[in-house]
Every structure is written in structure tokens, then in C-alpha cells.
């Protein structure tokens, strides 16, 4: 069943489970992911980057919507790291149930302005909106890029941002990086910031790029 991100992550937060997200760039990958989703009865986020969205055939997007609508497992179709207002609007028109506007590299006030604009349009269509504060690093081997220096999400700024924009979910920067981590690269995860953000904000948080990353555990 099709859901937006706000609806799905609200349930996930209440029940205490995480929701995986997979970038879908081909019919083969879509079929493989959906087969596992149905077998495991696991909610999932099917997403596309702006490059994928701009270059794949519309038939793949329609296949994503069709596969999601014919299963009883919750499925979100999400535009990840939307780089322009126009791209986000096209994704909404194409049937995406969730969009991200990533203006985190812009000055703070500009980030607020474009995010507000996206929320106004998306919420009219019952599409949830994700935004980002701070920056995600790079391992040097990902097409998604990232920055060489990580700017961690500031909890006070995050609270102000959420209140002013009306976003539904927030992607936070706690030290992860896009791509697969080389053996000699050790991320400096700030789980303390993540906890403060969780305690401060009343919307679901999104944290990205955990591929091949071993999280610390309490002994």
C-alpha cells in the first residue's frame, strides 16, 4: 500500500523499528526489493536521486507505483536529495508520496524559504516533505557526493527550522558519509547529538549512509 513518509515513520517510531530505503534505478532492482519486502512483510522506502529521476523512463516510476499499490505492505516512493524546487514538483506530479528538498548547502534563511515553498505545494497533495540540516560527508566512492568536512546538525537550529518550515521529517548530520567506508576510514559518529535531536524535535529523524558501517554498542 502506498503511504507517505510521515505516516510510515510515525508508526515505525511508535513500534520501535527502522525502515530501509533503496535507490531504484532499474526494473530488476525493483523486482528484487519488492520480492523481499513481500516475503519479510517489511515496510520499505523506494527512492530515486535527482539524477535517477531525471534519466529513468517514466515506465519505471509507474512500475514502482503499481508494485506499491498492489501489496498490503506499506511502501513510500521518495525523491531523495531533491536539488531544485522544479524537480520536487515534477516528482509530486509523477506520483511520489514523499519528497526531499536538500538546500542544506545554501545559507540558512534561503534553506528555510525554499523548504517552506516545497511544503506548501507538497502538503496540498498529501505528500510528505523531508529536508536536511548539516552536511553528510563523503567516502570518495559515491555518486551522491558529499562534503569533505562534516557540519553536524545543531539541535537549536533544527528546532527553529522545523517550526518555521513545517517539514515532516528531518535528515540529520551526525557524522556519516555517502558511499562505502574504506577500511582505514573511521567516521566520528555523534550519537549524543542524535539523542538531543530526538528529545528536542517531535518529528521523525532520518539518518543516512550506514552502508558497511559498524555502529558502536554498549558493553
Where are these regions (language model features)?
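N-terminal basic/disordered segments at the start of proteins
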Residues: 2, 23-27
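Glycine-rich anion/phosphate-binding loops
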Residues: 82, 108-114
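Short glycine-enriched loops at secondary-structure junctions
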Residues: 50-52, 81-85
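Alpha/beta enzyme core
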Residues: 8, 27-44, 61-62, 66, ...
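Short, surface-exposed connector motifs at secondary-structure boundaries
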Residues: 13-18, 42-44, 71-73, 198-204
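N-terminal amphipathic alpha-helix/helix-capping segment at the start of soluble metabolic enzymes
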Residues: 1-19
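Hydrophobic faces of well-ordered beta-strands that scaffold small-molecule active sites
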Residues: 19-22, 44-47, 75-79, 99-101, ...
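Conserved small/polar residues in nucleotide/adenosyl-binding loops
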Residues: 211-217
